[in-house]
Amino acid sequence: MSKHKSLKKQREALCEDLLEAQFELQKANLGPVLLLVSGNDLAGKAELIYTFYEWLDNRYLNTRAFTLPQGIERKMPRLWRYWRSLPPAGTLGFYLGSWYHQPLIQLSRGRMSDTRFKSEMEQVTRFENQLAAEGVTLLKLWLHLDDDHAQHYPPREQQKQYDSLAMREWGEFSTTEYTKVREAAKRMSELTSTTIAPWIQVASSDAEARDLYVGKLL
């Protein structure tokens, strides 16, 4: 059997399993199940989510994408807006620009001390423990590319296709800056990867293998 046919067979079987699991989740009114999708902008975060919208029943899927706090959000505790945006039980939620993003970008750009970052991550861990106590299941994904892919961004005019997705988190940065992002992400993982909400590294140079891997995790 060719590699293409093998992958197609795996994908079809996985889709059936996922649809069955989604039905059972909705029927039991459990969850929600949240997928926090983080990592390199060019690792296919949006494409990964689109794949699950193709595979699953869209009626029970939700996507949350966050920019900087606006309006009343600025007056409330930092994690408040994430709490109030939780999707209902029995559904699956994809989060881009989650509660990790702003502290992570501030640390990687030297705008936040490690002490402050550690304090922020302690708050996040308490928040996630609270979510778990309320029945929420968390799956935290860090999509990464090998060095050849990660360190060679396309020209600005080619980046427009990614900007149009309204899901670009990091903006344009150099190889050195990306190295700092990875260092900050390692620190983040050390502080917040727990039994109930571990960080999972997802190799993303091969999009189809990436999608199958995440689908099996689900």
Regions found by a protein language model. Give the residues of each.
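Glycine-rich phosphate-binding loop of ATP-dependent small-molecule kinases
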Residues: 1-218
